[in-house]
Amino acid sequence: MKQYLELCQRIVDDGVWIENKRTNKRCLTVVNADLTFDVANNQFPLITTRKSFWKSAIAELLGYIRGYDNAADFRALGTKTWDMNANDNLAWLNNPHRKGEDDMGRVYGVQGRSWQKPDGSTIDQLRKIVDNLSEGIDDRGEILTFYNPGEFDLGCLRPCMHTHTFSLLGDTLHLTSYQRSCDVPLGLNFNQVQVYTLLALVAQITGKKPGLAYHKIINAHIYEDQLSLLRDVQLTRTPFAAPKLIINPKIKCLEDLETWVTMDDFDVIGYEHHEAIKYPFSV
């Protein structure tokens, strides 16, 4: 929590007001933020200064792992995070590539599991990474990226947290995740849970020990309609100790994540938190 709160305070104190054309709102903004999560010692980075709905964040990550491209599939997993971007984003609603209600297009997990090649075939980036790591191989290119500028017009949203690089040192697996843009009051709560959980899951299914997860954010911002709640409410609260994430040990391989795993296979213990805060969401 300390590094999260320090980032929030840094934005409040040092941020610059930037007009965001997509949302027609101003954002208090800083550039370059680095967070580190201790997965080895199960220090789960769940926000305690407000109630956090961690299951929705992990459900979204599971949808990415499965390569889902439809908001209905995410809802079936237990998260509504894609409903607004799929169905209320005016630019996407007017996009001729949109296939209909709940369609997200070629975003996030679609790119991670089915990156289009010029010859019409596809690359399964995640499969390659898992196969290599399972064999103890780190080719210095164990990279999962969702950032495909050539297909931005085929999806409802450019990826915010866009690239994950796995590094194997001995039998310990580390992760570095890159995020171009972060809505700190709302998005970071989800994003840091996903960075942590992605390393924990990939380490588990490849038989490696989890190490550290490094979360690198380029543009960290607070929307103008979120500022008072963050500054005058959340930042006045005393944080609690970090909880622990429990993952079903029966999850052994990528196919398990693709097929039978549900939110019932995850639990959080020792989670103390303050009351929820309803921050505005900008589409």
From Swiss-Prot:
Pathway info: Pyrimidine metabolism; dTTP biosynthesis
A cellular-component GO term for this protein: cytosol
Catalytic activity line of the entry: dUMP + (6R)-5,10-methylene-5,6,7,8-tetrahydrofolate = 7,8-dihydrofolate + dTMP
Active site (UniProt): C160 (nucleophile)
Gene3D superfamilies from the UniProt entry: Thymidylate synthase/dCMP hydroxymethylase domain
Binding site for dUMP: R22, R180, S181, C182, D183, N191, H221, I222, Y223
PROSITE patterns registered for this protein in UniProt: THYMIDYLATE_SYNTHASE
Residue sites binding (6R)-5,10-methylene-5,6,7,8-tetrahydrofolate per the record: D183, S282
Keywords of this entry: Cytoplasm, Methyltransferase, Nucleotide biosynthesis, Transferase
InterPro entries: Thymidate_synth/dCMP_Mease, Thymidate_synth/dCMP_Mease_dom, Thymidate_synth/dCMP_Mease_sf, Thymidylate_synthase, Thymidylate_synthase_AS
GO molecular function: thymidylate synthase activity
Catalytic activity, EC: 2.1.1.45
One Pfam family of this chain: Thymidylat_synt
Gene Ontology BP term (one): methylation
Subcellular locations according to the entry: Cytoplasm
Chief place of localization: cytoplasm
First-tier enzyme category under EC: transferase
Quaternary data: Homodimer.
Similarity comment text for this entry: Belongs to the thymidylate synthase family. Bacterial-type ThyA subfamily.
Biological role stated in the UniProt entry: Catalyzes the reductive methylation of 2'-deoxyuridine-5'-monophosphate (dUMP) to 2'-deoxythymidine-5'-monophosphate (dTMP) while utilizing 5,10-methylenetetrahydrofolate (mTHF) as the methyl donor and reductant in the reaction, yielding dihydrofolate (DHF) as a by-product. This enzymatic reaction provides an intracellular de novo source of dTMP, an essential precursor for DNA biosynthesis.
Name assigned to this protein: Thymidylate synthase
Organism the protein comes from: Photobacterium profundum (strain SS9)
Gene of this entry: thyA
